[in-house]
Amino acid sequence: RDPLCLIQISSGNSDAHIIQLDRSNYHAPNLVKILANNDIVKIFHYGRADIAHIKYYLKTETNNIQDTKIASKLARSYSDSHSLKTLIKEFINIDVSKQFQSSDFGGELSPSQLKYCANDVVYLHKIHEELSKILIREKRLDLYNECLKFLKTRVDLDLALFKDDIWSH
């Protein structure tokens, strides 16, 4: 298991806050308050992995979750590509580099790594907004919301090391 090194947060106003965690104790009480707060929407892209890391290392639930990968798979059934890079290109019309996706984020971050981290979150609000429009138009919003309810259970199954699809025959 890779350690949780950093968390990126954006309010959707082109800002990005990159929080590097103290891996000796993972003490981040203000961050935990934000993550647990039901009044603050947390938008992820493939939240399953991130939420598992957060729960494992920060010992907190992440509440009021949205997930652009799940939304994309339900809204964009015309496509097999649901990567964040693809969604940024389709909805924001920007090509972002994923060169630093597999980087060491545990040390001092270079300007290029910081830009990569920021790009990972600054577009999520707009993408979520656009995907929500499609989900509503295609009458799949309720299905999406039900998937989000199950996401925490899927995370708990992952943390309990149930790697098999328990729904398969």
Summary of predicted features, one role per range:
Residues R1-T86:
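Conserved RNase H-like, two-metal-ion catalytic cores of nucleic-acid enzymes
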Residues S10, N38, L74-A75, F91, ...:
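Generic structural signal for hydrophobic core residues of well-folded globular domains
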Residues I34, Y57, L87-F91, I134, ...:
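Residues that form generic nucleotide/phosphate-binding pockets
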Residues I40, I92-I94, R140:
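Short aromatic/hydrophobic-glycine micro-motifs
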Residues A52-K55, K85-K89, V122-E129:
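A broadly conserved amphipathic alpha-helix scaffold signal in soluble, globular proteins
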Residues H82-V96:
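A polyampholytic, Gly/Pro-enriched intrinsically disordered region
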Residues V96-D156:
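Acidic, Mg2+-coordinating catalytic module of metal-dependent nucleases/exonucleases
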Residues K149-H169:
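Long, charged alpha-helical interface segments
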